[in-house]
Amino acid sequence: MLIMKIKELYIEDRLEDLNIKVPINNNESSLDIHITQGTSFGSNHTTTNLAIKAIMKNINNIDFNSCSLDLGSGSGILSILLSKIGFNSVHSCEIDDFARKESLINLKKNLVQDKVKFVDFPSNLRTKYSLIVSNISGEYLEKNFGYIVSKLMERGIFIISGLNKSKKESFTNLASIENIKILDVLVSGSWMAMIFEK
């Protein structure tokens, strides 16, 4: 679905600018996303591909009149996509200052900088999101799953990518504890993305 070179790496080194095409309207047209050369995560990894597929697969289930959250935004690719598919308000959360700087360059290059606002971890925000997408690995999502779900609106969509397939049972149990539905699981090689609905 995503036209790009895929590397099975966590650390990226984009030696040149990338033009990424995301098919829409049953592949009749595409959204173009431009990512500058750099090292922030989020363009050349299988999990980014899975996250984009998950977003596009659920595009008809999303309330675009509310706000979305890109949690662990890296290069900004998912924030850019969210802006281009219809969100006028996107919160981008990234703790790495260098990644934020690269992301801002990418937001401006894609002309969506006015739609995206950088936020710290939304512990102090009263915002409820119709869509939260997170393409990060490690234990962070497991430890904070309940809190992140609490930031979803009713019928809100939560997309997690960056997961090894071995984590499926753990996140299935977390979904049961939080009483949210698993809509789908997308798999590519050893990686997976899970799609939840509150």
Language-model region placement:
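Residue-level preference for short coil/turn positions at secondary-structure junctions
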Residues: 16, 28-29, 64, 86, ...
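Residues that mark the start of a beta-strand
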Residues: 31-35, 66-67
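Conserved SAM/SAH cofactor-binding pocket of Class I
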Residues: 39-120
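C-terminal lobe and adjacent flexible extensions of AdoMet/dcAdoMet transferase-like proteins
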Residues: 196-198
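S-adenosylmethionine
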Residues: 53, 95-194
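Ser/Thr- (and often Asn-) enriched beta-sheet segments in non-cytosolic proteins
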Residues: 19-21, 32-34, 117, 181-184
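N-terminal auxiliary segments of SAM/dcSAM-dependent transferases
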Residues: 1-26
